[in-house]
Every structure is written in structure tokens, then in C-alpha cells.
Amino acid sequence: CYYWLHRMGHESAVLWAAHAVHHQSQDYNLSTALRQTSSGALLGWVFYVPMALAGVPPLVFGVVALIDLLYQFWVHTEQVGKLGWFDRWFCSPSNHRVHHAVNDAYLDKNYGGILILWDRLFGTFKDEDDHEKCVYGTRGLLNSWDPLWANAQVYAGLAHDSWHARHWADKLKVWTKPPGWRPADVAERFPKPAFSMAQMQIFQPPMSRAVQWFALVQFAVLLTGVGAFLWQADTAPLAHNAIWFAVLLVGQWALGAVMQGRIGMLMALMLQSAALATATSALGFT
């Protein structure tokens, strides 16, 4: 089930819109594994219905899903080379580097989460070539530190093309066809340049030393806040969680905006303070 969910996440535009968040990073390290979609569960559950119909107990499903998720953390690294026989049977760092690459030779390969046998069985396996360095990211470059835009980018593009398509069938196909497919009339009115590896430049807007230190401290504070939020989320009321989630989101958005030079550090602190004050007032804190 996971193999087909993952594969369709690359072959169906609406599923790719959710999964793209995980692939947007132009670096490939353990932090990439933590870059997870916020909307994948909206349609992803459909692929696990056969397991429910087959009578798989929820506890077994949950444990296996957790093992699958935790296993995939360590394969997001460039520090581990090829592992010989292990690469032939399992999802490994080498195999998963191929999966994250945008090179023509590597595109849409190696979907297996733990076993790579599924890719060998269904014809989607590709070995990492020592002469073809993996280039990471997405072909529709994000070029932003905005967490909201990161989650909405692909959806926005699909909505635009669907809205402007003249034929109703094309309005639907925009969402179901493979990523990159566009109705002829939309492509003519809103042309996009063809993909080129030359455009895969690392997004690295200039930052002063002060901004770099500001970002480091802010990230540490936000990371602590996220940890505290997750620690109590299961027992806290929904309204409580929603309010603190909004505070953290404002903080993350403001930090990204500072790093891109869209707002200054003082403005970011003012926005974060306003969000925090509003939250504490709404929750009745004094």
C-alpha cells in the first residue's frame, strides 16, 4: 500500500501537491526527513483501505506505519555511501538519494519505504550512478522560506490552471494527470519555460551576520515551542491547540520573511509579540 501511495504521490498532480513539500529541500540530510506534508492524509488514507478490508488490526497497522516512518529517517543522508547487497534489497541512503533527485535519469524512481524489492518488481528501480551526481529539490523551484507558501505552492498552480482551462474535462485532468501536465489552451496563454538543470541553483538569499544570529536564536526558540506544543497536544482542548499552532505559525512565517529580506527583525518581533499577546488573552492568561 505504501509503495503505491508513494508512487501515485509522484504520478498524480493532486497527490504530488501534498508530497512536494518533502521534496522541496535542495539539501539532502536528516532534516529533510522531518520536512513532512500537512495535507497528505486528506487523500492518502484511500490507499490503506485494502488493509482495513483485509482485516488488519488498527494496532498492527499503527505499529508497522511507525516502523516504516522511523526507518526512513536515516536514509536521508549523503554521508553514507553504497552498501553493496543491502542496496539490492532495502531502501538505503543511496537508493533514496536517487528518489529525491530531479535528474532525468533519476526522476520518479525508488519509491520503496523499507524494501526496494517493490521497485524492482514494478520497474521503478534505478541504481545511483557514480558519474551522475544527484541534484535535489523540485523542478518547480520553491525559492522561498515561507512555510505557508511551501505547502500551498503546487495547489496554487493547479488551481490557477484549472480555473483558466476552457474545457470542464481539462479542469479535472489538471488535478489527476501527472505533475507538469497542462491543458493546451492554458499552456498557450500562460507559458512556462521548459525545465533545465541549469535553473537548479541553490536558493540562498544574502543575509547579514545579525540576521543569521537572529535566525539561529529564533529557530531555537521556535523549536522549543514546537516541542512543548506536541508534548501537550493530546491532552489540551482543540481551541487551545489551534491558538498555539497559530502563534507558532506566525513565528515561523516571520522568521522566513526576515531571512528573505521581506521584513525587518523588529517587525518580526512585533508580529510575534502581537500573536503571543493575542493568544494569552484569548486563553485567559494574565
Regions found by a protein language model. Give the residues of each.
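Residue-identity detector for threonine
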Residues: 32, 37, 77, 124, ...
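Substrate-recognition/cap regions that form aromatic- and gly/pro-loop-enriched pockets
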Residues: 204-285
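Phenylalanine-focused residue identity feature
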Residues: 47, 61, 73, 86, ...
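Cytosolic-facing loops and C-terminal tails of multi-pass membrane proteins
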Residues: 131-215, 222-242
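Membrane-embedded catalytic scaffold of the fatty acid hydroxylase/desaturase
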Residues: 1-147
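A short structural micro-motif
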Residues: 69-70, 178-182, 277
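Weak global preference for isoleucine
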Residues: 67, 114-116, 202, 243, ...
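Short, structured coil/loop segments at alpha-helix boundaries
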Residues: 12, 83-86, 96, 103-104, ...
